[in-house]
């Protein structure tokens, strides 16, 4: 089995840096174009005219090559940016698929014994029913918002806020 390790934030930062470098090079090429493609002869003799024409031809060839390199550079930056987005999406999907079963396994004994998870947010009360919001996890998690006229659920003891009360009610307490 092979593993791929990528840091999407670092890839996105590299793409931004490369885009900045590309725009700087593009500005330098645009500034140099007039001076390198239309070189004036130093004198009126044939040798000066021929040398100026040769330098001008080299300048035009450089500008054509530079335009091709700029096109490649833009495509590379776009591919790098898209790759960073793809890696970030894959990491998020992978984390979501791992986290849910793991949290279910951690919370199962606490739900069975205490009726409250160890980690996680409480469910919101149904609107218009007056149902209270669910309590958040014992350690971590926010309480759920209460339904109309009902209090919000309790938040976690270490981290988390009590849920917002429904219309006409107060918010939940900590713990």
Curated annotation (Swiss-Prot):
Keywords: Cell wall, Secreted. InterPro entries: PE-PGRS_N. It comes from the Bacteria. The keyword Transmembrane does not apply. Residues 1-93 form the PE domain. The keyword Secreted applies. It is found in: Secreted, Cell wall; Cell surface. One of its GO terms (cellular component) is extracellular region. Its main location: secreted. Belongs to the mycobacterial PE family. PGRS subfamily. This is PE-PGRS family protein PE_PGRS8. It comes from Mycobacterium tuberculosis (strain ATCC 25618 / H37Rv). The lineage of its organism: Bacteria, Bacillati, Actinomycetota, Actinomycetes, Mycobacteriales. The gene is PE_PGRS8.
């Amino acid at each position: 089995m092979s593993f791929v390790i990528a840091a999407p934030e670092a890839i996105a930062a590299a793409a931004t840096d490369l885009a900045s470098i590309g725009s700087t090079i593009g500005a330098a090429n645009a500034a140099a174009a007039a001076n390198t493609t239309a070189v004036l002869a130093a004198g009126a003799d044939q040798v000066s005219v021929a040398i100026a024409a040769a330098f001008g031809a080299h300048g035009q060839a450089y500008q054509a090559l530079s335009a091709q390199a700029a096109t490649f550079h833009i495509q590379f930056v776009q591919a790098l940016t898209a790759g960073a987005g793809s890696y970030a999406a894959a990491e998020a999907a992978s984390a979501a698929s791992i986290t849910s079963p793991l949290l279910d396994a951690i919370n199962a004994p606490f739900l069975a014994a205490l009726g409250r998870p160890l980690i996680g947010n409480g469910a919101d009360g149904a609107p218009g029913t007056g149902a209270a919001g669910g309590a958040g996890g014992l350690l971590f998690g926010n309480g759920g918002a209460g339904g109309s006229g009902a209090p919000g659920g309790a938040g976690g003891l270490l981290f988390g806020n009590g849920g917002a009360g429904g219309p006409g009610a107060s918010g939940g307490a900590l713990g």
